[in-house]
A protein has these predicted regions:
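Non-catalytic accessory regions of SAM-dependent methyltransferases
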Residues: 1-46, 53
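Conserved Class I SAM-dependent methyltransferase catalytic core
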Residues: 220-283
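Conserved SAM/SAH cofactor-binding pocket of Class I
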Residues: 100-202, 229
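Short loop/edge segments at beta-strand edges and connector loops
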Residues: 78, 171-172, 272
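Active-site beta-alpha loop architecture of Rossmann-like, nucleotide-cofactor-dependent enzymes
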Residues: 75, 195-198, 251
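Conserved beta-strand segments of alpha/beta enzyme cores
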Residues: 87, 142, 166-168, 266-269
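Mobile active-site "lid"/loop adjacent to the S-adenosyl-L-methionine
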Residues: 194-226
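Conserved AdoMet
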Residues: 34-110
Length: 285
């Protein structure tokens, strides 16, 4: 029978993760696990709190560390990811929400608050984090969300139920949006796949091995395929004066501006994220 590793200290835990993270990231991952799963304070962590975990806690810690040492993301190991002040269930088959996407939600809620925006569509919803956050932060809005993935929709629906968010979900391929659909929207928002295949070599191995490629990558020869399809759908489905919000690949920022202008959108804006990268676009029809 295989013997599980014994972990006696915080240092031993984070050093075990150095094949997948740099030192600072490894320490942050371990602190998140110890604080949120085992209830340790930072003082506990640095003062031998790991050694004082009881037998059942040690067994759970060993199981979690075995997954982390295989490169499984901490969010999958914990079963959730924080986003906009809430915990969203995540697991294999759904992209882990990124902190920068919170800015897209804030922007959408601001847009809803200053206009008559009521009907909102989130295309490529994944875990549902964008749609659910908007529904909860702007409770007068009516939010719908699409995704092509059955696994993603299952998780998104579970999140909406657990967070008491009134979101209507539908299985739909963003590349084949129903142009004959009579439904109209005030706001369409999307964070579609935008990482070019040639960028794979720059990405962390644990992301490549565990997160769904379907939600990440686009062909090098047509990296704007989702944006183009959604923009064309928006011309048909947005009400006059309606807004289109995207999270984008900063490497394609100028191409995105050109695409939206060529598709006859007005007031096209490019907005930087907290790190100064061109991460979002806004346009009206």
């Amino acid at each position: 029978m295989k013997t599980m590793k014994q972990y006696a200290s915080y240092r031993q835990l984070w050093q075990a993760l150095l094949p997948y993270y740099d030192e600072r990231e490894a320490q942050a991952v371990v602190r998140m696990m110890l604080e949120e799963r085992f209830g340790l304070t930072l003082t506990d962590i640095v003062c031998d709190g790991v050694a004082r975990l009881d037998a059942s806690q040690q067994a759970e810690l060993q199981e979690m560390m075995a997954k982390l040492e295989q490169g499984e993301p901490i969010q999958y190991v914990m079963g959730y990811a924080p986003f906009c002040g809430r915990h969203f269930h995540v697991g294999p088959g759904v992209l882990i929400p990124r902190p920068e996407t919170q800015q897209l939600v804030e922007w959408a809620v601001e847009e809803i608050g200053k206009s008559a925006t009521r009907s909102v569509l989130d295309i490529g919803t994944g875990s549902g984090c964008i749609a659910i956050s908007i529904a909860l932060e702007a409770p007068l809005s009516e939010v719908s969300a699409w995704d092509i993935s059955t696994d993603a929709l299952r998780i998104a629906r579970d999140n909406a139920t657990s967070l008491h968010a009134p979101v209507e979900f539908r299985q739909q391929d963003a590349l084949h949006a129903p142009m004959e659909d009579r439904e109209k929207w005030d706001l369409i928002i999307s964070n579609p796949p935008y990482v070019m295949e040639k960028e794979r070599k720059e990405m962390a191995d644990n992301v490549l091995r565990h997160e769904p490629s379907l939600a990440l990558f686009v062909p090098n020869d047509d990296p704007l395929r989702f944006y183009r399809a959604i923009a064309r759908y928006g011309k048909h489905a947005l009400r006059p004066g309606g807004t289109l919000l995207f999270e984008i690949n900063p490497l394609l920022a100028e191409d995105m501006l050109r695409l939206l202008e060529e598709e006859s959108y007005q007031h096209v804006q490019l907005i930087a994220d907290a790190f100064g990268k061109s991460r979002f676009t806004k346009a009206t029809i």
